[in-house]
Amino acid sequence: MAKYDKADLERRMHGAVESLKHDLAGLRTGRANAALLDPVTVEVYGSQMPLNQIASISVPEPRMLSVQVWDKANVGPVDKAIRSAGLGLNPIVDGQMLRLPIPEMTQERRKELSKLAGQYAEKARVAVRNVRRDGMDNLKQDENKKEISEDERKRHETEVQKLTDATIAEIDAAATAKEKEILG
């Protein structure tokens, strides 16, 4: 049974790109985006819960987030969780609604976030290269077991390399676009 599976490699590489896009969406760019609050967890009902499971998040204005807490008892913990999340956001409590004005970013903060976007991209590139290495190793094992010929192995290795190059180009494009967005 051949170990090489091109569809599996494509799926895993695509997963690395999707993970990067999710990470980049969470970086604050000066514009309101509900994904900013994805990493926020709130201590309620005796456990940590993601904010989006105890409140609805909307973007009423370009520089304002709105968090509608469903249970009035959770307003305090939600306020505390957002303030302590390290996002630089200070909620204004209005009943069960929290308004989060998005402050202007300093040039220093923009550079930090740009650097972080680069780190996320590098993490995704490493993941893609690891998938590539797994694919190449599987091809060599298949050839050693005489399941594929040397010519087939070389042809598949070329396919894997093309897939890797295309995926890394996609990662670079996403990271570059995000860095431009952050730096203004």
From Swiss-Prot:
Q: Which GO terms describe its cellular component?
A: cytosol
Region described as Disordered: spans on this chain: 133-163
Please list the GO terms describing molecular function: ribosomal large subunit binding
Note one Pfam family from the annotation. Answer: RRF
Concerning InterPro entries, the annotation shows: Ribosome_recyc_fac, Ribosome_recyc_fac_dom, RRF_sf
Q: Which domain of life is it from?
A: Bacteria
Recorded protein name is: Ribosome-recycling factor
